[in-house]
Regions:
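Charge-patterned, long linear interaction tracts outside catalytic cores
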Residues: 92-93
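Non-catalytic, surface beta->alpha helical segment in thiol-disulfide oxidoreductase systems
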Residues: 59-89
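Short alpha-helical
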Residues: 14, 40, 65
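Local sequence-structure signature of Cys/Sec-based thiol-disulfide redox active-site neighborhoods
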Residues: 1-29
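Thiol/disulfide oxidoreductase modules built on the thioredoxin-like
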Residues: 47-53
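Thiol-based oxidoreductase modules, predominantly thioredoxin-like and allied folds used
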Residues: 29-41
């Protein structure tokens, strides 16, 4: 299955830089939408996420959240699973 990762960012946003760096470390390609001067893309992000803050991270059209949520998922080991880099162990029967 092809993974689609989209990240809405602003030019001088440190949180955006951190989120993108984490995705790069994970070896993931992503589509970046710089909404610094793009009102149309900013409105699109707000409509999709129901929030106005960046970054806005979407994986397969599902809102993951921002930088904090992305790092929280990583710390819990759930980001690798979500990105398809790790599978959950099968439950014992």
């Amino acid at each position: 299955m092809s993974m689609k990762i989209e990240v809405y960012t602003k030019l001088y946003c440190a949180y955006c830089q951190r989120a993108k760096e984490l995705l790069r470390i994970k070896g993931m390609d992503f589509i970046e939408y710089d909404i610094t001067d793009d009102q149309l893309k900013a409105a699109e992000m707000q409509l999709r996420s129901q929030r106005q803050t960046v970054p806005g991270v979407f994986i397969n059209d599902t809102l993951i959240g921002g930088c904090r949520e992305l790092f929280d998922l990583d710390e819990q080991g759930e980001l690798d699973v979500l990105l398809g880099q790790l599978t959950l162990p099968a439950e014992s029967k």
